Structures are given as C-alpha cells and as structure tokens.
C-alpha cells in the first residue's frame, strides 16, 4: 500500500485584527495550537492564489472591519492508504477532529 501527501485547504475567521499580516500570523498560531497535541505532524502554511491579471502570488487573507478571513494550507503524510480517496478521508478525519468546526477541503493528493 502506497504513502500519500494530502494537502487540505481551511478557512479561519479572526476577529479584532489590525492588519493582514497579523491575521495570517494569528490564524497559523491558532491552527498550530489546536493541532499540536493530537496532530503535530501536520504542516501549516498561509494559502496563496495566483493573480488573474499579473499572475503573481497573492495571500489568501481578507480584512474587513477588523475581521479577517484567512485561507490556510495544511499538509499531512498518510502512510499505507488503500487509495487516494482513502488517504484524503484519513487526513480530513485526523485534522477535522483536532480543528472541530473549521471547514476543510481536499486540495491535492500526491503519491509518495
């Protein structure tokens, strides 16, 4: 059975924030705190998207009225999964249990 690298997308809402950089830092910190005891092997990064006009990379954070929506990318290695779908289900289950009410979406599954 092969090993997989599963990439998940998550959305975090941060209140009372002053800047986009603060919002991203707080979101990564909060995700790390929730994942640390049970799923400390999950890598957390700020999400990036491609600009449709200049094709440069943009941060996936938006701050309006001191409230931010931050997109994070979570990566987890899943060992000995039966298929890509099985690896995605395992990753969503492990990360979902630690993060509770945070929406998750499978972005990519790569065989290692």
Swiss-Prot record:
InterPro entries: UPF0212. Belongs to the UPF0212 family. This is UPF0212 protein Memar_0858.
């Amino acid at each position: 059975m092969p090993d997989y690298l599963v990439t998940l997308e998550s959305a975090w809402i941060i209140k009372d924030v002053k800047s986009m950089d603060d919002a991203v830092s707080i979101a990564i910190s909060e995700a790390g705190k929730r994942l640390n005891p049970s799923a400390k092997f999950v890598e957390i990064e700020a999400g990036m998207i491609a600009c449709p006009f200049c094709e440069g990379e943009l941060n996936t954070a938006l701050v309006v009225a001191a409230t931010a929506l931050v997109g994070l990318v979570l990566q987890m290695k899943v060992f000995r999964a039966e298929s890509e779908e099985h690896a995605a289900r395992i990753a969503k289950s492990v990360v979902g249990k630690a993060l509770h009410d945070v929406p998750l979406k499978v972005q990519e599954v790569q065989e290692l």
